[in-house]
Amino acid sequence: MTSKNPIQKALYLAFERAQWSVLRDAVPMTLSEQDLENLRGINEKVSLTEVTDIYLPLSRLLNLIVKAKQQRGLVLDEFLGQKPSSSPYIISIAGSVAVGKSTTARILQALLRHWPEHPKVDLVTTDGFLYPLADLKRKGLLQRKGFPESYDMKMLVEFIAAVKSGQAHVNAPIYSHVTYDRIRGQHQTVSQPDILILEGLNVLQTGLDSPVDIRRPFVSDFVDFSIYVDAEEHLLKQWYQERFLQFRKGAFSDEKSYFHHYASLTDDEANVIAAKIWDTINGPNLQLNIQPTRERAHLILQKGQDHLMSHVLLRK
């Protein structure tokens, strides 16, 4: 178990892929190849072997942690003489654009649902809490989309606080990657899940990162277990460019797409534009706001070439 980063070495237990995979401990595979196909994102190459080696041990770990939290809650309820509470266990998944957070979140949701202790697992992405496109334009934040200031943090924190407090039904806005905007009049309802997975760029931020008020609550204040999906920046940029080319052939070809004007680009033209977007928006956001929060995570999944997990770091 080694880590090149001295901070990570001090804070984490480091597992190579083979070491981590044995911790599955006979947990059965509950996904088929078709299930996995439905969970994959654009330009993702996750295989059933990846699920077996990486995600099944992780689902076992999370199941043990959630059960321990549930037992502690029952003890506290008995001590206080009150009815069992309905506060969900909240897992956050952070990381860069194009690292595969969404696919990781969907796979974990599918696996965790199969444990009898917590069959109801909801997944919410923070994309829906981006300010509406018109507001971003008005505030001059369109070129800062994805940066912390482009999110309605008040709405996001109020949402997660309501879910954590056990409120019966809590609505979250829905985001469209086609229109590049919130979908008006539509929402996702979260109704007292056993586990809520919250996926987004900046979910590991704390009040210390806020230029406004270090005292106000942040998403991380409500999270029970946090995961950071990590990769070297040159790989992230490469994956972003590859994904951009895939979108150009797919989603961008939709006339309703905000990026429809990119659909007719040649490969070379598309690569130039994708590289510019990375260098001016996604790269700086990673360096300034996302990567500095990495060592706050309880668990880091490190990816290498071809999106394959190479190491897992678990907080001591």
Curated annotation (Swiss-Prot):
Q: What is its EC number?
A: 2.7.1.33
Among its keywords, does the record have Transferase? yes
Q: What is this protein called?
A: Pantothenate kinase
| Pfam families referenced in this protein's UniProt entry, alphabetically | PRK
Its Gene Ontology cellular component terms are: cytoplasm
Question: Which amino acids does the record list as binding ATP?
Answer: G95, S96, V97, A98, V99, G100, K101, S102
Q: Report the family membership.
A: Belongs to the prokaryotic pantothenate kinase family.
Q: Which UniProt keywords apply?
A: ATP-binding, Coenzyme A biosynthesis, Cytoplasm, Kinase, Nucleotide-binding, Transferase
Q: Which GO terms describe its biological process?
A: coenzyme A biosynthetic process
Source organism of this protein record:
Shewanella sp. (strain MR-4)
Q: Which domain of life is it from?
A: Bacteria
Provide the protein's localization: Cytoplasm
Q: Does the keyword Protease apply?
A: no
